Amino acid sequence: MKKLYLLYLLASFTTVISKEVTGVFNQFNSLIWSYTYRARYEEISTLTAKAQLEWALDGTIASPGDTFTLVMPCVYKFMTYETSVQLTANSIAYATCDFDAGEDTKSFSSLKCTVTDELTEDTSVFGSVILPIAFNVGGSGSKSTITDSKCFSSGYNTVTFFDGNNQLSTTANFLPRRELAFGLVVSQRLSMSLDTMTNFVMSTPCFMGYQSGKLGFTSNDDDFEIDCSSIHVGITNEINDWSMPVSSVPFDHTIRCTSRALYIEFKTIPAGYRPFVDAIVQIPTTEPFFVKYTNEFACVNGIYTSIPFTSFFSQPILYDEALAIGADLVRTTSTVIGSITRTTTLPFISRLQKTKTILVLEPIPTTTVTTSHHGFDTWYYTKKATIGDTATVFIDVPQHTATTLTTYWQESSTATTTYFDDIDLVDTVIVKIPYPNPTIITTQFWSGKYLTTETHKEPPLGTDSVIIKEPHNPTVTTTEFWSESFATTETITNNPEGTDSVIIKEPHNPTVTTTKFWSESFATTETITTGPLGTDSIVIHDPLEESSSSTAIESSDSNISSSAQDSSSSVEQSFTSADETSSIVELSSSSDIPSSSIGLTSSESSTVSSYDSYSSSTSESSIASSYDSYSSSSIESSTLSSSDRYSSSISDTTSFWDSSSSDLESTSITWSSSIDAQSSHLVQSVSNSISTSQEISSSSSEESSTSATDALVSSDASSILSSDTSSYYPSSTISPSDDFPHTIAGESDSQSFSFITSTVEISSDSVSLTSDPASSFDSSSRLNSDSSSSPSTDQRDILTSSSFSTLIKSSESRESSSGTILSEESSDSIPTTFSTRYWSPSGMSSRHYTNSTETSVSDVVSSSVAGDETSESSVSVTSESSESVTSESVASESVTSESVTAVSDISDLYTTSEEVSTSDSNSGMSSPIPSSEQRSSIPIMSSSDESSESRESSIGTILSEESSDSIPTTFSTRYWSPSGMSSRHYTNSTETSVSDVVSSSVAGDETSESSVSVISESSESVTSESVASESVTAVSDISDLYTTSEVVSTSDSKIVPSTSVPSSEQRSSIPIMSSSDESSESRESSSGTILSEENSDSIPTTFSTRYVSVSLTVGELSALPSLPGKLSHLPSSLSETSIGMTKSANLSPQFFSTSVDSALSYWASGSSSADHQSSATCDVSESSVEGNLSAMALGMSNSDDGLSEDTRSSSVAGKEEIELTSTNSVGEITLISYSSSSPTTHDHGRVSKSMGAAPLSSLFSVSVHAPLVTGLSDSDTFPSENSNRSRSFKESTDNTISISRESLGNPYSSISSPSDYDVKSFTTSRELVSSESILPFSDVMDANDMPTSGSNLHSMVFSISVLGEKFNANIEKHKNTNGHYSSMVFTYQSAGLEESDQRIAVTNTKFDQNKIDTTIDSNTFVTSLPFATTLNDQIDQAVPIKIPASSTAGFVSDVLKPDYSKSVQAESVQTDSTTYSEMMSSKRNKNSGFGTSSLNLKPTITVVTKSIDTKVNTMKEGGVSKQVSTTVTEQYDTSTYTPASLLVSDNSGSVSKYSLWMMAFYMLFGLF
């Protein structure tokens, strides 16, 4: 047991120490095809070969048990009976290598080797091994075999094996097997075990496709057994040069498999595909056997075919043997006289000698000894020795001492200088170093809490810096009072390690003084001081006095005066007793929180405190009793100011309720943010028994005056002022008390409603009331009216509901008019109800998301009500007249009323104000607003004059509903900017204006629904003598990108022709209503309704846009236009072009083609367009080549705007005309190519006349290939004399031929084949200068050389002019070191450009005239120049490769900069002339431009060069050189190319038309 355990440990130890080594196989010597020892039915003869490789093992690197592997890709198996081979030297095996065949399971075979115990550390052996192998080129549907079937192609291939990371390569020529390409394909491949084989069969092709078929094989031999689990079935449309499939596609089939038969049955198989089946079969090993193959099928054309086939297998096969030859490598060392070591290899003959010796020649070893002495010279002495001893060299040097001095200098480097002293033997060493850098020390604060220092060293002559970083100083903040009225902060920053100070200076606190009664008999004052931002208090304690509670009123006249001032929040009231003759009740109220106080005509003392938070309501009423005579004089001047803060309102109501006499009190209302105004009251009374009281209905308090209520109840029914006040307060508290004073306290929230309706009814005939106030608005706008005017309320943070009612009566006339404005606002919306009117020079408003609607009614009421998107506004203006109303002279004779413009403003970016359009009622002419671009300019009202004895009634209602959850988009905007550009997106504005009734602006977004209704009704007799009427235009504008302005067209009712404001582009201009004039005794009723609905979730498609953008994609480069209109470069995508041709060769003019859209996507679509034409004309003279190309963009017609009615993905019908003029000079090829992307179909499916927001539907592309036909002389003969074109060419006096072609649909279906022309060989190259794109031109260019909006872009004409000199006559003028050049200038011409701007590129064409002349003969072809790989590549001149006349075929190959220093000799050239013949034959039999689809479009050219290196090995014996051996090294270099141009020559020297057409095809599509 212990012995077994020890053996196990030993095996484990051996396993652990073994390793994988590489580099054993170090060279692939040769690959020689084998033609012996094989069965006739087995592997293809050309694919069994012997591979010879060299190997070497070194005992210092490898050890026993180590492994190494040779991997051989694309090798099917080893052609030997053996399972391994040994690497031997002198009959000693140093490694054993096992064969591992890939067969159908792996894509490679391998040789796995293990080092034997014979290799020791002092052993070094080398040798070679010959391995018989078979390559895998197909013959199964397995994954590995399909992969290997693509490894090689016919001709020279590189074969590479791998030893670790080391690649071992050689080249070999593989011969094809194409005889089975169009027949039944059968293959059998034996395995290494020789008892199984892979049996493969592929059906005969059906070019039209298969309808049905049956494919398989069977055998009657008893030892023949099919492995049904190894079956592979597929179809393929690709086969390699050995007729084997290189792809496998699954398809529908049925398998029937037994041990002796395998069949598949199938139905439809598409054209171009062939079915195949294979399986592994167990075969007999001792006797012959037969295999029968079944191949039955019916093609799509209905033809049934059955092709049976039988294979016979005879005697067993004979394989080659793997051989290994090696020898020992011995390294010996010898000592020789000399100073260097040399290595030499002694002569070795592998078949005679078994050891290879490497001799290392080493010199006698030498030792050096150094001594010193006191002197000046150095002495050398050598002690010689014989081989085997050691020589000694003595060096005696003088002894010196040195002194070192260090100094500074102005340089940045260090220098050392030594001065030798040969007298005193004391040397001086001076070291110069740069001056030390100066240092700057700075101190700064940093975020850390500790001090640190940073030092930055600079190079010499620089400045070093030291940064001391200190933590921030602590800060002490103090607050103090100062004398100013505002707060400020002062910061004092000290140096590091100090303390910073922040001093906050606050204004002194306001002081509130309160007087209280107390029980003491003396008065005292108490002062309470608080900190900054607080309120100090002074409390005055007074003794109690009972007589201050009330005051009797004795006088019959009372004047109550009220004023509102902004001071402190205190309320004081005083009342006089009833016994006093005259009393003045003074009410002083001011606070940031609106408060109000009321004077009561009562002996009781009441204190009313009202606390309201930002809400107010105003009600004003006037009533006069029905006595015969009284007069009233109101205030003449009242100034109303408005600011941005909230302004509370004071409402004074004067009630005359004495029954004996009355007087009228005039009340003025002050609107102010600061509530700082003055009111003056003038009261005149007939009797002294007049009492004046005040009624205030406010949204901030809930109170009423009992005296006023009693007066109203006791008054006459004909003179009742009915006041209905409704107020809502969530929290109100009324605390009545029996004791005096009564205290009523009310607290409300910040959002409240107040609805006040006032009605005035007067039935007494003797009452006359005249009111002529003059109001002035000094804030933002100005309004002058002949009647009463209600000021606008600037309100930001509250919701206000106001109602005004004013009674106006002239002498000897009766008139009643009432106006009601009702506004409801959502209680939970953002406070946005406000009305802003302004007048400023700049007309700029920065307000965002506001909606303002202004309503102005002539001679009645003017008010402004605004609502935001979450509001619902209803504005109603009513004017009704009673039975007998006479308005003789309401205003002066010359009345000028200003028409008010409603301004609703929401601006995303820029919003300018609206200017008021004025109209004169006397002249009846409206003045248009002078603006080139206007939005929402709405003349609201033109005032009119009424004559005497006329009656008028008008009713106007405007209803606007807005969605509460929509984005605030209800607005009307005008602006003016230089670019006329708006950044607004998806807006919809509707404007409405009605003359003489109501004007409003109602706007809605796409999610809103707006309805505007205007009704005008008149009573019995309405006279409108001079009324200016304006026609209103509704403007609806939604723009995707650019929005142009719309201008409202106005008309005057007096003047019949309408005046139109100029506008370049208008959209959705809808006249709503044009008012008319009516004469006297006529009745008029007019209504207008606008309904606008927008789909909230749809993309806005109603827009006014003109956007034209043109971009041109050149070649493969697409870039935005740069340097528009100043074209100076040509894009780099123009391919480098080079062609090589021979004399007496046939050039097919199929080479000439014009293609629109290089991708040919339109031709593929199959449709056609009659709108497109393209033409190319090329005129070749002795000194120039000129051509004109013109093309239209697809989908365009010849209309004025160059656009068709709809977008079409159309195809192209092209017509080409080419005119060539011959010269006797060597020519060139000009290749100009343009390409562009295909048109885009837009979502709206239609392109409007202005193209919407889309670019041009399509651009054009033109490709012109125009080789110059040169080299003709009078003695030349023309082939194909029966060609009409050829005769036309010959008979022309100017040697000109015209070729025309017309193509519809597929361009290849109608290309004709003109006759061939004689040319000389020439080459061209091109050097481009930049890679910027080409911009198409328009008819009109602006100052920036950009196309203007009105440009005609539907067609562009390019002119190409090649300017140069004759190559053969004047070429020497352009000679330089690289060759001969002739410059060519491409000129593009278009309207709007100067000639100096038309030069865009310079192309250099170079060639060597002498080189071309010397290489032209009947059996030599000139290589063409390669395509340039980068923009500015310089291309070397053409270097010919001469091919012997006995070659199979001549060729032209692309040689990418070959090594010209070598002697290049063509060893062999293989091409498949049969295939090209088939191509040419197919080409001649078809009147098409390309031939059949199965032709190989990328032929391959293989060039093999052989270099021979001969080396004579000599050896000296006795001073005489003796030749020992001669080494001849043959190096084969194989290069394979896929040329851009291929000229295949037959014995007559003609050139295939297919080759030239293929060459043009490649250049056209840029395949290279």
UniProtKB/Swiss-Prot annotation:
Glycosylated where? N559, N851, N988, N1188, N1284
GO CC terms of this entry: cell surface; extracellular vesicle; hyphal cell wall; plasma membrane; side of membrane; yeast-form cell wall
Q: Low complexity bias: where?
A: 547-662, 721-738, 768-793, 801-824, 872-904, 919-945, 993-1002, 1009-1030, 1063-1077
User: Which stretches does UniProt call biased (Polar residues)?
Assistant: 909-918, 956-992, 1046-1062, 1272-1286, 1294-1303
Mind telling me which residue stretches traverse the membrane in this protein? none
Alphabetized UniProt keyword annotations: Cell adhesion, Cell membrane, Cell wall, Disulfide bond, Glycoprotein, GPI-anchor, Lipoprotein, Membrane, Repeat, Secreted, Signal, Virulence
Q: One of this protein's GO BP terms?
A: cell adhesion involved in single-species biofilm formation
Covalent lipid sites (GPI-anchor amidated serine) = S1548
Propeptide boundaries: 1549-1568
As given in the record, the signal peptide range reads 1-18
Each ALS repeat, start to end: 403-434, 441-471, 476-507, 512-543
Disulfide cysteine pairs (residue numbers): C74-C151, C97-C113, C206-C299, C228-C257
Give one Pfam family, short name only. Candida_ALS_N
Entry text on domains = Each ALS protein has a similar three-domain structure, including a N-ter domain of 433-436 amino acids that is 55-90 percent identical across the family and which mediates adherence to various materials; a central domain of variable numbers of tandemly repeated copies of a 36 amino acid motif; and a C-ter domain that is relatively variable in length and sequence across the family.
What is noted besides the main data?
ALS7 gene corresponds to a hypermutable contingency locus meaning that the diversity of ALS7 proteins provide C.albicans with a large and flexible repertoire of similar but non-identical surface proteins which may be important not only for adhesion but also for evasion of host defenses.
Name under which the protein is recorded = Agglutinin-like protein 7
Task: State the organism of origin.
Answer: Candida albicans (strain SC5314 / ATCC MYA-2876) (Yeast)
